[in-house]
Amino acid sequence: VYGEQYYHRFFGLVNYSYNIGKVHVVTLKNINYVGHKKYIEAITDADLDWLKHDLSFVPKGSLVFLNMHAAVWNSTEGEGNVRNAEELADALKDYQVHVLTGHTHYFQNNVMDAQLLEHNIGAACGAWWKSQVNRCGAPNGYLVMDVDGNQLKWHYKSTGHSIDYQMRVYGKGNMLSQPQYVVVNVWDWDPSCKVEWLQDGQAMGEMEKFVDVDEAYAASKGHKEGLTATGHLFRALPSSDAKSITVVFTNHFGEKYEQTVLISNPKVKTQIIAHRGYW
């Protein structure tokens, strides 16, 4: 189409790959214009064949980063996922693959199996241009991939914060839809992670995972109806005489992040007093 021709003219091919150390990096188009200002999220047969041919030169078991625009396996707003995800997964089955996508302005990790993980990464511009958070409540930012040989770690880097900023805690009364709870948004969560809490220094176990609209996002939109909910929220119900709540997030790599809030007066909004980063 016309737009792709212009891209070719000034930048080059839309599909390309290269190696950095032991990592094979692929960029693949998955937005296809169908006319009348409409598009579909799909990988064409020709592009899928190109990917298979490209990977035929890569040793099986290699670490592969696949960059695309639209999400592939999101559970939230899955109607926007790539249509032919099964064919893509089959083409990738012999490799250790991290699929890096955007499009949604929403952060979601999708673990398909031990060898295939999608990071649908929040946008640097947040929920379209004027917001400091994405639609899931994740801060504006980007994902940092640290590679040593074929070993990988990743961390979400929020703009305006250190890389230790990995969660946002809402004290009791600070999330309008959950007034009795302490709530935490852990944007880089996946099922291998843990979100635990302590009340006045006593371990209370894991927090309850639930789905709701993030408070920071809701506030940025005037708490209007119909906002997108997020699945990486967790809550705990403090006792009536609790003085402090500590949240501990253990990430995919066993790194721990801790944040404490005081509950000095149930009529006063909670004050955050500590954010200690790694243990």
List the predicted regions and their residue ranges.
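Short, well-ordered beta-to-alpha junction loops that form the rim of enzyme active sites
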Residues: 67-71, 103-104, 157-158
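Extended active-site neighborhood of metal-dependent phosphoesterases/phosphodiesterases
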Residues: 1-60, 79-100, 106-148, 152-155
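Short beta-strand elements
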Residues: 255-279
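Binuclear metal-dependent phosphoesterase catalytic core
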Residues: 116-200, 231-262
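Short acidic, glycine-rich surface-loop motifs adjacent to enzyme active sites
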Residues: 55-76
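Aromatic sugar-binding surface patches on proteins
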Residues: 213-236
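Contiguous segments within soluble domain cores/interaction surfaces
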Residues: 193-215
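Short, surface-exposed linear segments at secondary-structure transitions and domain or protein termini
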Residues: 165-166, 213-221, 266-273
